[in-house]
């Protein structure tokens, strides 16, 4: 089993594919017993995306390198013990392959706020995403995998995909995702939800278009574009009971928040203001851990290549599903659409997401301008 002990690095060193049908119930009715769990998923999802984008779009100077090097925690190499891997992407001479990040939001029950702490059976993942930076560094694609997806977990048979982290930590999770998708994972990130309200406030809040008047964190807001602070954004993503499509509408809200944060980072002057950038990076990096192979040098190389990426170049999607079901042992599960999923996975594996979207125009539903 891969050693996942904590190490400190050297300073040098869109839109979901919403399936038709009823909302996906929480596994074993967990949400009824743990009311705070679902809103954490939103925070973790956004944090993972922002982590990749910020590390890949900042013109990283020496002071940023120092901040990242001293603040980011690392996992020991989770790829070292893997004997079976998805194939490397084939590229033409002179071209660069896409870079794929597996981003997890950990439901940490051991050491709150420390995403590197893992023990067998102690925690599962609340959010699972593959974030791909295209080989030409012009596009970012974010594919979410429902945590209750019923899949083959190597050595454990059929199980929910989020159980892989509980069974075998980062290494087994990578192996499970690669086996399911055929997508070669290059780097691994685990994020926690601590300090996320502060992160939202660091960028001056986020603008969300509300479809209806709402009361968020005790403030009555009209329909239309509204600037939300951290507390209000949190309340916005926690709501579920009053939404007509339940969890699926909540997914829309989560992804709207993701896009709003990214847009605000690019438009608010955060990236050009050293003081604000340092504060923002500190908030992001204090709630995440990466594999030790993701060095600051690689982050800097990624930064140079992604300097022209903007929020319009980021696409959000969810693995196609085929409805919900119950497992033989009574768990509430999500069945994946094998045929539709295979096409999407192939597009990611071959760095052809743009071509996939052009040839399958109805497969990805763009995030609406206004969200419930």
Where are these regions (language model features)?
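Amphipathic, coiled-coil-like alpha-helical scaffolding segments used for oligomerization/assembly
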Residues: 162-222
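Flexible, polar/acidic helix-loop-strand segments at domain edges
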Residues: 97-99, 195, 199-275, 279-281, ...
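Extracytoplasmic
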Residues: 96-99, 123-128, 137-140, 145, ...
């Amino acid at each position: 089993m891969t050693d996942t002990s904590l190490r400190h690095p050297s300073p040098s060193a869109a839109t979901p594919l919403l399936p038709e049908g009823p909302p996906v119930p929480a596994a074993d009715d967990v949400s009824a017993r743990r009311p705070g769990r679902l809103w954490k998923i939103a925070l973790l999802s956004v944090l993972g995306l922002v982590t990749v984008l910020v590390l890949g779009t900042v013109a990283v100077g020496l002071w940023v390198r120092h901040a990242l090097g001293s603040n980011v925690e690392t996992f020991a190499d989770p790829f070292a013990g893997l004997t079976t891997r998805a194939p490397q992407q084939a590229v033409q001479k002179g071209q660069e392959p896409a870079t794929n990040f597996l981003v997890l939001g950990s439901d940490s029950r051991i050491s709150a706020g420390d995403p590197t702490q893992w023990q067998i059976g102690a925690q599962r993942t609340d959010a699972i995403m593959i974030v791909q930076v295209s080989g030409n560094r012009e596009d970012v694609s974010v594919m979410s995998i429902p945590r209750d997806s019923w899949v083959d977990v190597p050595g454990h048979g059929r199980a929910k995909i989020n159980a892989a982290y509980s069974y075998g930590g980062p290494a087994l999770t990578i192996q499970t995702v690669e086996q399911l998708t055929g997508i070669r994972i290059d780097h691994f990130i685990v994020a926690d939800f601590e300090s996320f309200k502060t992160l939202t406030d660091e960028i001056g809040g986020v603008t969300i278009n509300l479809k209806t008047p709402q009361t968020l964190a005790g403030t009555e807001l009209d329909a239309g574009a509204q600037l939300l602070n951290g507390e209000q954004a949190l309340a916005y993503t926690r709501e579920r009971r009053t939404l007509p499509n339940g969890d699926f509408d909540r997914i829309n809200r989560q992804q709207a928040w993701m896009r709003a944060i990214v847009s605000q980072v690019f438009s608010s002057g955060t990236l050009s203001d050293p003081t604000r950038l340092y504060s923002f990076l500190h908030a992001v990096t204090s709630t995440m851990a990466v594999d030790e192979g993701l060095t600051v040098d690689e982050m800097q190389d990624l930064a140079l290549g992604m300097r022209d990426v903007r929020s319009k170049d980021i696409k959000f999607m969810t693995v196609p599903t085929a409805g919900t079901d119950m497992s033989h042992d009574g768990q509430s599960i999500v069945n994946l659409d094998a045929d539709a999923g295979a096409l999407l996975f192939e597009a990611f594996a071959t760095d052809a997401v743009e071509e996939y979207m052009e040839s399958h125009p109805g497969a990805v539903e763009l995030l609406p301008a206004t969200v419930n």
